[in-house]
C-alpha cells in the first residue's frame, strides 16, 4: 500500500526537547503503558490523555480515501482509549467499529461512547475472517511489534 499522509498534526515543539528531559525512571514508567503513561506526568508518556476531538480534523481525508460509509467496518488496532473510533462514529453514523488494545488500562478508561466496541487482545491471531474489515487502522501500534 502506498504512503498516505492524513496531515496529522505535529506538535509546536520538537519531540527531541521532551526526550532530553526524560530519565530512566520516566522510561520504565512509560514502558508499563498503564495509568501513569496515559494519565500521569507528561514525562512518563501521554500526560493526561483526554478526548479532544482531534481526529475529526483528519478523518474526512481517510473517509474519502477509503470510501467509508455507514455500511463500512473498521478495526482500530492499538485503539488506546477509542478516540479515533469515537470521532469516526460521530462523522459516519451506523459505521461498524471495533478496537483492539493490548493493554488493559486504556480500555478500562475508554471513551464511554465506544467502550463496548473495544476488546483486549494481542495483535496476532485475531478472530476475524480475512477481509472482514474495510479498513484496519494501526496508528502508533505496529512499530512496537516484533514482525
Go through each PLM region and give its residues:
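Class I SAM-dependent methyltransferase Rossmann-like catalytic core
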Residues: 40-54
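Conserved alpha-helix/loop element of class I SAM-dependent methyltransferases that forms part
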Residues: 52-69
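Conserved class I S-adenosyl-L-methionine
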Residues: 71-80
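A short, conserved alpha-helix within the catalytic core of class I
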Residues: 145-147
Amino acid at each position: 500500500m502506498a504512503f498516505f499522509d492524513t496531515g496529522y498534526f505535529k506538535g509546536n515543539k520538537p519531540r527531541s526537547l521532551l526526550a532530553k528531559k526524560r530519565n530512566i525512571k520516566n522510561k520504565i514508567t512509560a514502558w508499563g503503558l498503564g495509568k501513569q503513561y496515559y494519565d500521569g506526568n507528561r514525562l512518563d508518556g501521554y500526560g493526561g490523555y483526554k478526548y479532544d476531538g482531534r481526529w475529526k480534523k483528519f478523518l474526512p481525508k481517510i473517509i474519502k480515501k477509503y470510501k467509508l460509509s455507514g455500511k463500512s467496518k473498521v478495526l482500530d488496532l492499538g485503539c488506546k482509549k477509542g478516540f479515533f473510533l469515537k470521532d469516526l462514529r460521530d462523522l459516519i453514523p451506523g459505521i461498524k467499529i471495533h478496537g483492539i488494545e493490548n493493554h488493559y488500562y486504556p480500555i478500562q478508561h475508554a471513551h464511554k461512547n465506544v467502550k463496548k466496541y473495544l476488546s483486549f487482545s494481542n495483535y496476532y491471531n485475531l478472530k476475524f475472517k480475512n477481509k472482514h474489515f474495510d479498513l484496519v487502522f494501526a496508528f502508533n501500534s505496529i512499530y512496537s511489534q516484533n514482525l
